[in-house]
């Protein structure tokens, strides 16, 4: 898709590359019902990671003026371990933590090729 990528997506992408270096971040951009924030019932554990991430963003968005999809933050990747830095404000800290937890969740969830680019209308009611 040619939709413009939110700034923060670039950081989330780098976080995923930190925890799951063996896969392209694109593999996670269109997976299951929730990787891309959809609806319905998550198809598997990886999709549940995305559902939690979407809900996390929704909660962060309740902070006044916070748009987690666009919020940049400071973090560090060292040997596959992600750390959100202490100089983030409340919005940045929340956004960073949402992305950090999702990237860790992705690393621990099996990837099922059959759940990539699925028919959302048919499978996500």
Curated annotation (Swiss-Prot):
Gene Ontology molecular function: calcium ion binding; calcium-dependent phospholipase A2 activity; phospholipid binding; signaling receptor binding
Family annotation (InterPro entries): PLipase_A2, PLipase_A2_dom, PLipase_A2_dom_sf, PLipase_A2_His_AS
Enzyme's top EC category: hydrolase
Binding site for N-acetyl-beta-D-glucosamine: 28, 53, 69
GO cellular component labels: extracellular region
Tissue occurrence: Expressed by the venom gland.
Protein name per the record: Acidic phospholipase A2 5
């Amino acid at each position: 898709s040619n939709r413009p990528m939110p700034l923060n997506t670039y950081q989330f992408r780098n976080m995923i590359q930190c925890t799951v270096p063996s896969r392209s971040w694109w593999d996670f951009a269109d997976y299951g019902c929730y990787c891309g924030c959809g609806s319905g019932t998550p198809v598997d554990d990886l999709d549940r990671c995305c559902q939690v991430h979407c809900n996390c963003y929704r909660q962060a968005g309740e902070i006044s003026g916070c748009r987690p999809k666009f919020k940049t933050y400071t973090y560090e990747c060292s040997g596959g371990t992600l750390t959100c830095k202490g100089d983030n404000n409340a919005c940045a800290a929340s956004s960073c933590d949402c992305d950090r937890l999702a990237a860790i969740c992705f690393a621990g969830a099996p990837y099922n090729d059959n759940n990539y680019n699925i028919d959302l209308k048919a499978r996500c009611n």
